[in-house]
Each structure stands twice: as structure tokens, then as C-alpha cells.
């Protein structure tokens, strides 16, 4: 995958993939992986700004260009808020904070230490991808001075020129995840906790979303509880990192909960499949999502659907495997196969 090209800080709005969404909120396409895959959201209120998720280090020039295009200086940013510390959301945070003299970083207490000293987070990434590929995808991750980091405990309220932003603990996708409820618009910035919804899968203005079960902290039951907590806020819209604004929130929330339960069922079906476990989960997950997309009315050909899901299916399957392994560690003695149990 290629890194987005740097953008001049003087670039006009028309030259940037910057979309106004309403209520002083803008979506910036980071260019990570492909277009309309990864969004950085900016909020502007009375000349002050907040940035929700940063994408990777490669996106920082675009974020600074977006601020300039909106008539803002780097010193006008009060908050950089991370929904969680996966690097497609937080990889650029340290580099961006170095360019924003007035900003403070807001992050879940479990993620704060990884932003202050990202060495373990970065090493784990390099262990998975190799250093060269990790740098190509994310760039290096810069540390942030602890004095500039605010731990987002559940219920913490931030203010942006008097506009209240409430941070809400949101485990299930990751234990270091928060969502942010903007009380002015009623909208919720959900990161990955309200799933993934690619605009290519929209049908007649109706979005399709599916859960993100990225390893290694996917917890299906907990994720459903987090979805319920967001639904209880009765938001008119929810903003996802992948990709941006969705409406018809109750319908999408019900779909996400149903599919989260199906993810768990697929995992349990193949829990004792040995060396075939991951491959079987991956195949069933691909079939599930393809079937759901057809039922939604998506008419893209199979090759295009597979291409759009090419990162998510293996990653989500790995997350289901991580969940199964965590269950096994908590209950090390597996149940004996019975008449209705899957064969080992």
C-alpha cells in the first residue's frame, strides 16, 4: 500500500479531500490504504478546533493543510482526541502534537502510556509487519510529553469554546477505546466501536455496516453492550473512522449486534478445528459478509466486493481467533464433544 502524498499547508479546500458534514464538523480522507477508507474528523467552534483521530504520520501534512483551508492556525487546536491507539487511528498523534502548540491529547487511560512512550507499540507493529513495511504503512510513532496527555476516564467532559464533548468508555473492539458524544449536534464519534461502513456499499442512501473484530481484544458480548450504550444516546448520526458519517442509527446498530453474535457463533463452530481453524473462520466470515451485502442490495461484482473486504476479512478472522484463545485461557479445559457439539 502507498503512503498519501504530502499536501501544502496553503492548499485550498477544493484541493483537499475535506467534506463538511454539518455542525462545524468536517471529514478529511487520510488517504490511508485507499480513498474513502480512513477518516480524520475535525470540529470547529468559534475559531477553536478539535481533531478526532489522526490516522498515520503520513497524514499529518494533510491535517495541517485542512486547518489552514478552514482559516485556522495550528495554535487554534485545543484537543486531539484518540478513539483508541491502533495505528490507523493514532499513528500520527505524536507528530501532529509537535505541530500544535496549544493542543492536549485525550486518550483512554489504557492507551495513554503507549502515546507517551510508543516504543512497545511500535515494536509490536514491526514484529508483525517488519520494520520497512510498518514504516511504509504508518511512518514512525513519535512520543508525546506526559504533561500534554489527558486520560479520558468514563464521563469526562471536554469543552471546545463552550461546546461539550463527553468521553465514554467503549470496550469490545479494544479495551483502550472511547467514543465521544458531541452534545451540541447529538452525534457520536465512534472510532471502530460502531463498525465499518464503506460508502461503496451504500444502496439508495442506506449504509451497510459490519463489526470490526480486530485482534487482540475483541469481546463480542462487551461490544454489544457498547453498541447499546451508544444507541441509548439516540444520536441522529454516528461518525466512523471507516468511513465517516452514517445515519439510520437504530437499524445499523441492530445489524451490528446481530452480526457480532454471528461472528461469535462462527468462532465457536470452528473452535476445535486445529490447524484449519483460522482458514475455516475466514471462509465463513467472507460468506457471511457477502450474503449480507447481497441482502442489503449491493450489486457490485464478487471480485470488487472481495477487493473491498480484502483487509477486513482476514483481520476480523484473526480477531475472532484471539477471542477464542482468550476464552481458552480463562477456561483451559475444553468441553467434551457431544451430539450437538462441533467435532474437534
Regions found by a protein language model. Name each.
Residues 14-70, 180-192, 196:
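Conserved beta-strand hairpin/beta-sheet module of binuclear metal-dependent hydrolase folds
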Residues 4-10, 56-58, 115-171, 175-239, ...:
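Metallo-beta-lactamase
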Residues 106-113, 118:
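A short, structured active-site edge motif that brings together acidic residues
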Residues 50-52, 81, 105, 187-189, ...:
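Residue-level marker for buried hydrophobic side chains located in beta-strands
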Residues 61-107:
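Active-site metal-binding motif and surrounding structural segment of the metallo-beta-lactamase
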Residues 2, 265-344:
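C-terminal regulatory/interaction regions
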Residues 216-233, 238, 246-286:
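Internal alpha/beta domain cores that form substrate/cofactor-binding pockets in large enzymes
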Amino acid at each position: 500500500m502507498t503512503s498519501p502524498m504530502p499536501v501544502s499547508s496553503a492548499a485550498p479546500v477544493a484541493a483537499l479531500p475535506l467534506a463538511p458534514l454539518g455542525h462545524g464538523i468536517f471529514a478529511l480522507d487520510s488517504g490511508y490504504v485507499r480513498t474513502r477508507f480512513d477518516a480524520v474528523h475535525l470540529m470547529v467552534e468559534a475559531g477553536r478546533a478539535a481533531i478526532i483521530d489522526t490516522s498515520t504520520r503520513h497524514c499529518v501534512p494533510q491535517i495541517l493543510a485542512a486547518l489552514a483551508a478552514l482559516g485556522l492556525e495550528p495554535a487554534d487546536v485545543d484537543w486531539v482526541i484518540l478513539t483508541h491507539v491502533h495505528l490507523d487511528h493514532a499513528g500520527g498523534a505524536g507528530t501532529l502534537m509537535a505541530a500544535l502548540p496549544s493542543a492536549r491529547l485525550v486518550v483512554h487511560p489504557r492507551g495513554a502510556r503507549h502515546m507517551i512512550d510508543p516504543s512497545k507499540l511500535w515494536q509490536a507493529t514491526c514484529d508483525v509487519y517488519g520494520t520497512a513495511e510498518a514504516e511504509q504503512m504508518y511512518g514512525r510513532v513519535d512520543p508525546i510529553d506526559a504533561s500534554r496527555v489527558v486520560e479520558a476516564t468514563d464521563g469526562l467532559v471536554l469543552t471546545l469554546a463552550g461546546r461539550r464533548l463527553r468521553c465514554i468508555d467503549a470496550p469490545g473492539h479494544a479495551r483502550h477505546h472511547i467514543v465521544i458524544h458531541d452534545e451540541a449536534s447529538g452525534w457520536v464519534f465512534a472510532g471502530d466501536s460502531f463498525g465499518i461502513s464503506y460508502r461503496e456499499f451504500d444502496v439508495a442512501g442506506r449504509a451497510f455496516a459490519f463489526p470490526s473484530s480486530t485482534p487482540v481484544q475483541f469481546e463480542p458480548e462487551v461490544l454489544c453492550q457498547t453498541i447499546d450504550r451508544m444507541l441509548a444516546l439516540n444520536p441522529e448520526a454516528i461518525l466512523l473512522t471507516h468511513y465517516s458519517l452514517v445515519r439510520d442509527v437504530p437499524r445499523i446498530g441492530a445489524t451490528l449486534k446481530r452480526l457480532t453474535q454471528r461472528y461469535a457463533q462462527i468462532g465457536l463452530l470452528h473452535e476445535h478445528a486445529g490447524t484449519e481453524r483460522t482458514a475455516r473462520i475466514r471462509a465463513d466470515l467472507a460468506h457471511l459478509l457477502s450474503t449480507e451485502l447481497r441482502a442489503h442490495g449491493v450489486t457490485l461484482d464478487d471480485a470488487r466486493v472481495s477487493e473491498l473486504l480484502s483487509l477486513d476479512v482476514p483481520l476480523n478472522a484473526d480477531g475472532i481467533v484471539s477471542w477464542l484463545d482468550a476464552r481458552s485461557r480463562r477456561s483451559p479445559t475444553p468441553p467434551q464433544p457431544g451430539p450437538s457439539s462441533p467435532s474437534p
